Amino acid sequence: KNSYSNYMLLPQKMEDALFAGDPPYDGLDAIFISHYHGDHFTPEDVLRFMNARPDVDMYVPSQAAIALRAIASAADQDIFDRVKSVDLEYKDAPISLVVENLEIEALRIPHSGWPTGRLDVANIVWRVTLDEATTVIHLGDADANDIHFSTDPEFWNSKQPDMAFPPYWFYSSQVGLNILSRRIGAQQSVGIHVPAAMSNDPSLRPAELRDVDLFTVPGETRAISGH
C-alpha cells in the first residue's frame, strides 16, 4: 500500500471484493507476486488475504515469503501450506513446476535500475500456462535491457505467450520493443505499472506511448484472443 507518490492504490471497494471473494474474484485460484516492494507486496495485507481466502494459493519470491513469515503468528501457520516460494539469483536457470492445471515457470530478471540500483531485489518473471492452452507472462518491474533476455533463447523460444504484461517502460525504447517482439513474442501485450499521472486518453500521453495498450484504470481487463 505504498504508492511512492507515483502509482495508484487499490480502491477500497475493489479491495473489499477481493478479500471477500465476490465477483469477479470468486474464481481466483492463485496469485503471483513479482517482488517485495511496497507498491507490489504488503506483508500485513497479504497475510490477511491468505487467511480470508483459504481457496487461493500464492507464488512468491523467497524475499516475500520471509517477510510474510516474519509477521505471522502461530495461528497463521496453516497459510504457508499454500505459499510457494522460489529462490533465484540473477542468471540462474529458470525453474518450472506443474500444479494441477497450471504449468508455472519462473525466471529472475533484474529490477529496473540495473546495473546500479535495486540489485538486491529479486524480481521474478512468471510465465504461466493454464490447461496446456493459454500462456500469460508477467514481467513485474523488469529492466528493459536485452542482456538479461539474450542468454537463454531456449527458454524464450519454447513458448509463445498469448498475453504479456510488461512494465510500461518497455514501450519507451527500441530495446524494450525488441525484447517484446523478438524474445518474448507474445500475441498480445498490455503495459502495466503505469503512473497515476498517465492519461487515459492516448493522445495526451508521451509520443512513444500513444499507440500501445496500457492499463490505466484499476480493475480493467482485456480479453485474450482465441480463448
Segments from the language model and where they lie:
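Beta-strand-turn-beta hairpins that frame and shape the catalytic cleft
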Residues: 95-105, 129-136
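Active-site neighborhood of phospho(di)ester-bond hydrolases with catalytic His/Asp-centered motifs
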Residues: 1, 27-39, 59-62, 137-142, ...
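Active-site-proximal loop/helix segments of hydrolase catalytic cores
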Residues: 44, 110-183
